[in-house]
Amino acid sequence: MVSLRPLTASDIPRIVELNDAASPAVPITSPQEMAELLDLAGFTFAAVDGDEVQGFLIGMTPGSSYASENYRFFDQRGKEYLYIDRIVIDQTVRGAGIGRTLYTAVFDLARAQGRTEVDCEVNIQPPNPQSLAFHARMGFARVGEQETKGGTVEVALLAAPVPR
């Protein structure tokens, strides 16, 4: 059974390992880049089983200086939102409900903060059909598409209302 806690700097080696194993669904990230991302994050969750991080989620709140093209799309919409920058689950435990547990925590946080939606993006080129299906089950709908990383990646921009 996993429990959730905030990510810490001591988690960086493990989350970089998980992150890079999930490429191309998420970009390869150096330990320094991951530390910078954690510094910018508005919220984080580590899904842990004992001492082992099995998955993680990094998110942003409105008004961050985060330079991501996808984050900027949502920040410019003028909504009260939380943005999920990345979620990664250890490949050996996918399908065990960890993703749903992490997303439930984000929706609970959004509700507690009075937010109206949760936003994220999923690659459509290169394709990530499992993630698109997961997000559809979680209530996300496509609100846009855009090319990023110099046209090498195309994403579906997704939003889900926060249940009251």
Predicted regions and their residues:
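Glycine-rich phosphate/pyrophosphate-binding loop shared by adenosine-nucleotide-utilizing enzymes
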Residues: 2, 52-56, 82
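A short beta-loop-alpha structural element at the N-terminal edge
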Residues: 2-15
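Active-site rim helix/loop that mediates acceptor-substrate recognition in acyltransferases
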Residues: 24-50, 58, 64
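Conserved acyl-donor/pantetheine-binding loop and adjacent beta-alpha core of acyl/acetyltransferases
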Residues: 58-86, 150
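C-terminal "cap" of GNAT-fold acetyltransferases
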Residues: 76, 145-164
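Conserved acetyl-CoA-binding loop-helix of GNAT-fold acetyltransferases
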Residues: 89, 95-108, 137
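Conserved active-site alpha-helix within GNAT-family acetyltransferase domains
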Residues: 100, 124-144
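Conserved GNAT acetyl-CoA-binding A-motif
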Residues: 110-124
